[in-house]
């Protein structure tokens, strides 16, 4: 008696790459057995632009406009890490007012980044309404950025020793009004999303990462804190002036997509607390360290006194990076953003190595999606929160 055998062939599906304004140029080669994911292979590099090598052929002030193209949804953080390294190498002091302004801008940028994560994440799992709501609040933040820096995105606002310009008249009151308004908006999001049974069905227990895996994979940011580890570089390293503000590290212990959502929602509330304290205690004084403009006193000024008086041309501060090695890091919206710098008594860094949080966090994706359903891939990928400009560099 012949027993007929059924031959099963796996299906290989290409997901992406998409346009950078959507999910980014990430390609996933997914092997399926029906609806079950057997394997997933991420293909990177479509947005690689050689950002590290560009840094090694530019002075820091020349390189600043490039760094806003890493994570183009949280550009204040890439600017901050770019100036923090040379400031520590050169032992340059940042005035207290400039440090407060930096903190305000960083936390506004964190909120904007989390908002633009929340909207597409909800759209991916079938909820279209929050996608339109988040742009309403994001526009207010971008209006504040435009008033202070002149640009809605790609701000080029941070400088070695301070910031490019002081806050304009009336900006503090406008920002304070936004903080009061945004707290009600977060309550609206929580009412609309957090207890929604369809939302909970899609995210609860999906993409679970335990504490041991988080540490072994080197994950950071909301991915780390959603698995029960209270680690936030704003508390650990106390860079800028975060130690002067009262706020709590947001964390969950479940480690699933819902926990990562709750961490980011809580972080937006804590960012508002930090901004309100910074606005209330904003000190007077200079917004930049004027001493860094006097590194080279021997050269004749490029413009005469008359032109300086009426055109207000600022010199471009550049100095030799001492022969040292340094690793600096900050808590970006997606995790630990770091720079490893090697100076060589030159205006250009000898080595500029970027530690991007998105690239590190993305490594665990194949493990998380195995034995899950095809529809869960977008839920898990969205909960990681990546920007391909930062991943590919």
Curated annotation (Swiss-Prot):
PANTHER family: NADH DEHYDROGENASE [UBIQUINONE] IRON-SULFUR PROTEIN 2, MITOCHONDRIAL, NADH-UBIQUINONE OXIDOREDUCTASE 49 KDA SUBUNIT
Top-level taxon in the UniProt lineage: Eukaryota
Quaternary structure note: NDH is composed of at least 16 different subunits, 5 of which are encoded in the nucleus.
4Fe-4S in keyword set: no
Name by which UniProt lists this protein: NAD(P)H-quinone oxidoreductase subunit H, chloroplastic
One GO biological process term: photosynthesis, light reaction
Enzyme class: translocase
Record's GO cellular component terms: chloroplast thylakoid membrane
Family of this protein: Belongs to the complex I 49 kDa subunit family.
The reaction(s) this protein catalyses: a plastoquinone + NADH + (n+1) H(+)(in) = a plastoquinol + NAD(+) + n H(+)(out); a plastoquinone + NADPH + (n+1) H(+)(in) = a plastoquinol + NADP(+) + n H(+)(out)
Organism encoding this protein: Phaseolus vulgaris (Kidney bean)
